[in-house]
């Protein structure tokens, strides 16, 4: 009798197929590793896809210099434990100019340390494909992006010029300098990700679990006081609150949520009841009209 695959098994099989397809079709692929929960799942799937061999590509982390300290510690540990080559790229010109999210704002900071830094890294190592952990349920511009997302020689994305994807057939043809961003988790939801992490016992950054942390309420968000670069504004004060993060980015631009969910089952239960997007806590999604789509057109993840 034929075994009926569960919903998560179907998603896993589709993702592994996409990862293998990219590895087979492209000469020099790389996996973007942001250290978040989606990256953790994608890394786990890549290891499964080629087990017992090591995946035939490196990990690339674009370091904005403003990531949570726990993320950097976790990144280095996971890369070492999994045996991956970890490439870390920083936009040194941005560092020299002293660009930071407090003085220059989230839009400029994101453009310099994420978008431009990613384009620099892709050009430097001549990658023709890059895996990303974006999902269609996260945000409206990502909802209309293909699994194989074509990028021009300048890394730009044109939402009106996308290739058809029929069933599980993907067009991997690119000219010199062009590239593809591949999204194996496109059809997953946030709840799918958490259930898979629980079932597969996948390690994740402790910031996803609720505990008492020092936070400041700023612009309607709870910002973690992660280091001494966070300067308090007049009237602000640091409070200890039980919080966790649904999404991770640069700490001054990522809001925590008040929560008591300290275990995976508790997080899953919380997800079953929530009615808001996980990216509501990402300031970069709201710093201008059509923010995410504009960033993606310019070369963002």
UniProtKB/Swiss-Prot annotation:
It catalyses: sulfate + ATP + H(+) = adenosine 5'-phosphosulfate + diphosphate. One of its GO terms (biological process) is sulfate assimilation. GO terms for molecular function: ATP binding; sulfate adenylyltransferase (ATP) activity. Its EC number is 2.7.7.4. It is an enzyme of class 2 (transferase). It comes from the Bacteria. InterPro entries: PAPS_reduct_dom (IPR002500), Rossmann-like_a/b/a_fold (IPR014729), SO4_adenylTrfase_ssu (IPR011784), Sulfate_adenylyltrnsfr_sub2 (IPR050128). Pfam families: PAPS_reduct. Pathway: Sulfur metabolism; hydrogen sulfide biosynthesis; sulfite from sulfate: step 1/3. CDD domains: Sulfate_adenylyltransferase_2 (cd23946). Keywords: ATP-binding, Nucleotide-binding, Nucleotidyltransferase, Transferase. With CysN forms the ATP sulfurylase (ATPS) that catalyzes the adenylation of sulfate producing adenosine 5'-phosphosulfate (APS) and diphosphate, the first enzymatic step in sulfur assimilation pathway. APS synthesis involves the formation of a high-energy phosphoric-sulfuric acid anhydride bond driven by GTP hydrolysis by CysN coupled to ATP hydrolysis by CysD. Belongs to the PAPS reductase family. CysD subfamily. NCBIfam families: CysD, PRK05253.1, PRK12563.1. This is Sulfate adenylyltransferase subunit 2. It comes from Syntrophotalea carbinolica (strain DSM 2380 / NBRC 103641 / GraBd1). The gene is cysD.
């Amino acid at each position: 009798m034929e075994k009926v695959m569960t919903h998560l098994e179907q998603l896993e099989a589709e993702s592994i197929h996409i990862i293998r397809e990219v590895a087979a079709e492209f000469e020099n692929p790389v996996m973007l590793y942001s250290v978040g929960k989606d990256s953790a799942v994608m890394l786990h799937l890549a290891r499964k896809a080629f087990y017992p061999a090591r995946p035939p590509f490196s990990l690339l982390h674009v370091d904005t210099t403003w990531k949570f300290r726990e993320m950097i510690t976790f990144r280095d540990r996971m890369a070492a434990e999994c045996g991956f080559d970890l490439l870390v790229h920083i936009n040194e010109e941005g560092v020299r100019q002293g660009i930071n999210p407090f003085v220059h704002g989230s839009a400029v900071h994101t453009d310099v340390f994420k978008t431009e830094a990613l384009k620099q890294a892709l050009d430097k190592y001549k990658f023709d494909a890059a895996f990303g952990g974006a999902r269609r349920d996260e945000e409206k511009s990502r909802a209309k992006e293909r699994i194989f997302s074509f990028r021009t020689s300048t890394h730009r994305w044109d939402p009106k010029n996308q290739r058809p994807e029929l069933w599980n057939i993907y067009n991997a043809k690119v000219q010199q300098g062009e590239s593809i961003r591949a999204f194996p988790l496109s059809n997953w939801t946030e709840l799918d990700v958490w259930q898979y992490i629980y079932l597969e016992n996948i390690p994740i950054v402790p910031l996803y679990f609720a505990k008492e942390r020092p936070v400041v309420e700023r612009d309607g968000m709870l910002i973690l006081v992660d280091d001494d670069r966070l300067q308090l504004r007049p009237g602000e004060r640091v409070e200890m609150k039980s919080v966790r993060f649904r999404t991770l980015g640069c700490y001054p631009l990522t809001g925590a949520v008040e929560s008591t969910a300290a275990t995976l089952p508790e997080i899953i239960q919380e997800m079953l009841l929530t009615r808001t997007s996980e990216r509501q806590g990402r300031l970069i999604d709201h710093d201008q009209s059509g923010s995410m789509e504009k960033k993606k057109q310019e070369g963002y993840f």
